[in-house]
Amino acid sequence: MKKMQKYYYILASQHFLMEEEPIAEVLKERTRNYHEQEKEIDFWLIKQPAFLEIPAMADIKKKCPQPAAAIISTNSQFITWLKLRLEYVITGEFSAPSDTIPNPLASLSTVS
């Protein structure tokens, strides 16, 4: 099994993250910046994140309008920055891979 890694996230409704806020622009700019610096990408936008389905996340899932979306990162400072920029989001963290979260980036969304 892979070594456990801590992941940080912001969580909001898909509508808020993907339509109301210009988050795609922020992520595109950050991706470009990472490529210029030859840094490995450490953030991902996930529609309907599967980690919300585990029992320990039930209360958090209830607080978030569905369908949800998350930006997950191994960089806590990036998530803190996003939280300050976006305001109306839920933040948290988890460790994976684990028995309950085998794939931290898994989505329940089917690609159409």
Describe each PLM feature range.
Residues 13-22, 50-54, 77-79, 102:
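Short acidic, S/G/P-rich loop/turn micro-motifs used as interaction or catalytic elements
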Residues 38-41, 66:
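Eukaryote-biased feature marking scaffold/signaling PDZ-domain proteins and nuclear chromatin regulators
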Residues 19-31:
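Well-ordered, non-membrane alpha-helical segments in soluble/globular domains
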Residues 1-4:
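N-terminal chloroplast transit peptides
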Residues 28-33, 56-58:
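Eukaryotic intrinsically disordered and solvent-exposed regulatory patches
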Residues 9-10:
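Solvent-exposed, low-complexity segments and loops of surface/extracellular structural proteins
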